[in-house]
Structure formats: C-alpha cells, structure tokens
Regions:
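C-terminal motif of bacterial Sec signal peptides marking the signal peptidase cleavage site
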Residues: 14-17
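Short N-terminal edge-element motif at the start of the domain
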Residues: 23-31, 36
Length: 174
C-alpha cells in the first residue's frame, strides 16, 4: 500500500513539474523574400511579434523593397487578433494566447498568401474592390500580390502601384 502511495505521489510530482514548465516562448520574427514591387528583384517581407505579454503584444508587418526602402507597414494589436478569434478558440491561458499568436506568425507567409499575379486578366472587380482604377492597373502590370488577415473576418489584399509608387489595397473582404 505504501509503495502504491509513493508511486502515486511520484507521478503527481512529475506531472506537476511538467505542467509548470509549460511556458510558451513567442516567436520574434519571420522573413520571406518575394518579387513584389518589381517582377524580378525581390523585396523583404517581415512579420515581427513585439512585446512580452499578449496584452501588450503587436504583430508588425513590413515590406522593404530591393533598394532597402520600407514601402509598407501594418501594425496589429494582439488583443485585436485574439478578440476576433475568441468565439472559436479556447484562449483563456496566457500560454494558449502566445501559442495562437505564434501560429499566426507561422502561417503569415504560407505560399497561398503570395498571389502571382495579383489580378489575372479575366478577373473582374466587385464591391470589395476599393479602387477600380488600381485593379485595372494590376491587370495590365501583372505584378504580384499578397494577402493577409486581420482576424477571421477580414482579409486584405495588397500590391504595388507602379503609377503611384506605393503599396495599395486592391481588395478587402471577409
């Protein structure tokens, strides 16, 4: 009987020790090279998780062109992302929130997010197209696009405007 109690106590101690070391470290950044503002030369896409706790963290997405000039920056508060997913995800513990944010960083540069070209010649703009002239420019230039999500209900599609020499949103949807 004492042997069984000792064994049970040992197992509980081991389990408790494993549980207390369950801290999840945040991924700091991911980088991807991609032809975006030019059809041949690559730009640097970077997603960075800034902050130490989910309540004060932000996802910072930047694009630096092949000349080293930052051409795009979007910062999203982690709390905004977490709120958008709280209904469908169980994110009560800090470690779960950090794990979720790490997943978002890891998925940010999935191949499906890089669109070659941004708009094909047979695609037509719809109500989610904020700038129809830019959409037509993309049909002509055949430059690549990229899309990312700011939550489960908002996707933003961006591309380089050769006419305006800046990154613009060409589609925004659910």
């Amino acid at each position: 009987m004492k042997y069984a109690q000792l064994l049970l106590l040992s197992l509980i101690s081991i389990f408790t020790a494993c549980q207390s070391n369950n801290k999840v470290e945040a991924i700091t950044e991911k980088i991807k090279l991609y032809a975006f503002s030019d059809s041949i030369q690559t730009d640097t896409f970077k997603i960075k998780l800034v902050g130490s706790k989910s309540d004060d963290m932000s996802l910072v997405f930047t694009i630096v062109n092949f000349d080293g000039v930052q051409i795009y920056k979007e910062e999203v508060k982690a709390t905004q992302l977490l709120k958008s997913y709280l209904a469908s995800e169980d994110l009560k513990k800090e470690s779960d929130k950090i794990r979720f944010l790490n997943d978002q960083v890891n998925l940010f540069f999935d191949e499906e997010h890089f669109l070659e070209p941004a708009v094909t010649t047979n695609q037509e703009p719809d109500n989610n197209t904020p700038d129809k002239a830019f959409y037509e420019e993309l049909k002509q230039s055949q430059l690549n696009g990229f899309y990312y999500s700011l939550g489960k209900d908002t996707s933003i599609y961006i591309a380089w405007s050769t006419k305006e020499q800046k990154v613009k949103i060409y589609y925004q949807c659910c």
